[in-house]
């Protein structure tokens, strides 16, 4: 019985880690086929992905631009909605919060098809602004949720103390609310960023083959079979996810975001 639990944990770790190890090793293949174990190990595929192959470097640039801009926009849009919901709880605030969460709840293919029709009517189909706006709408629920958690965690006695000292609502917002919710703001931004960086379905419809992100370029490359350069793209996704969630763990209140009870911490 004592041996069963360590063996089970080891099997779980191996089950999760094995695909990652295979992908990382496959990126080292010297040929054009993705083999495991790799043949003629080389870092040439990394050079292709980051430097010499324009289709990959451009796709990476598009992914970074869309993910960063859409995450920032989603966070900015989420702030007034979350603040209004926390401050007043009015029907309008509740309706806006529900509307902000709806795209994330819908099946991505439904949302993607709808956006494709919308952008085609406005003439923005296949443009980078359409991709940024689409991902901002899709991932708005993430910063909205983290900000709602952060605002709910504010100690009301701090607000009362600020009011007693004669602070206006604007001063209270800048000196009390913003500093205490900064970890949740950053968490929402990083969550939206990493999901945007990895998203494929919605971007497939709104890009209309006019440009490619890394996810779209991997899909396009499948026509020529599995290649080591695709494995490099997968490694980039892994590193981006690890970095984003590490930053959330470092600067955000991860236990509270995961639903931990403050009184038990």
Model-derived features with residue positions:
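Transmembrane alpha-helices
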Residues: 8, 13-20, 112, 137, ...
